[in-house]
A protein has these predicted regions:
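A short beta-strand element within the Helicase C-terminal
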Residues: 157-160, 164-181, 187
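Walker B catalytic acidic pair
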Residues: 10-11, 163
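Post-DEXD/H (motif II) to motif III coupling segment of the RecA-like Helicase ATP-binding lobe
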Residues: 6, 13-70
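Walker B beta-strand of ABC/ABC-like P-loop ATPase nucleotide-binding domains
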Residues: 7-9, 159
Length: 188
């Protein structure tokens, strides 16, 4: 830190983690400049990020400037959960079939690993786009195989528990199907 005048931190919403906090404190103790960047200015624990916000680029502005398209929302109404899961899966297949590029990938979000297996079976029964499952309880080899199928476009549907999380970079991920909590489909 003695040789550096500035510290630049990307993904700053993680900067409260003990290692980052200790690293930052060395710079702050020496009155060095710390600049933090994040597209997610919210911490998991609900506490605010430290420091002064000097620039905000809202999603609405990014959409207006053409970086993101507006979200197209489709909802599925059913009083029967099993039927709703099938209807959402069918809508995902419909959206993927309508994709002119043939490159879009869909994420089907569920709340538990048991639900992931159940919802995966629904997508598999529809017989399109070779769905795979990804969650933290999978063995590393199985998770890598599923990710490889997505990367190589052998699969275009991934069933996951909650969201895929930080570091999951797949620009072709355009469709989000929420099987738990909300029964909806968001297409970007």
């Amino acid at each position: 830190a003695e040789l550096c005048t500035h510290l630049f931190i990307d993904e700053a919403h993680h900067a409260a983690a003990p290692t980052w906090h200790a690293f930052k404190s060395v710079f702050k103790a020496q009155m060095r400049h710390v600049l933090q960047f994040t597209a997610t200015p919210f911490r998991e624990d609900g506490l605010p990020l430290d420091g002064e916000i000097i620039y905000v680029y809202p999603m609405r502005q990014a959409q207006r400037e053409g970086y993101f398209r507006p979200i197209r929302f489709s909802s599925v109404y059913s009083f029967n959960d099993a039927r709703a899961d099938r209807d959402i899966a069918a809508k995902v297949i419909e959206e993927l079939n309508a994709d002119a590029t043939g490159l879009h990938v869909a994420m089907a979000r569920v709340s538990t690993q048991i639900r992931a297996a159940q919802v995966l079976a629904i997508y598999q029964a529809l017989g399109h786009f070779n769905p795979v499952m990804l969650h933290s309880g999978m063995k590393k080899v199985a998770a890598q195989a599923a990710r490889s199928q997505l990367d190589q476009r052998q699969s275009r549907i991934v069933v996951c528990v909650d969201m895929l999380g930080e570091g999951f970079d797949m620009p072709e991920l355009k469709i989000a199907a929420f099987h738990d909590l909300r029964k909806s489909l968001a297409v970007t």
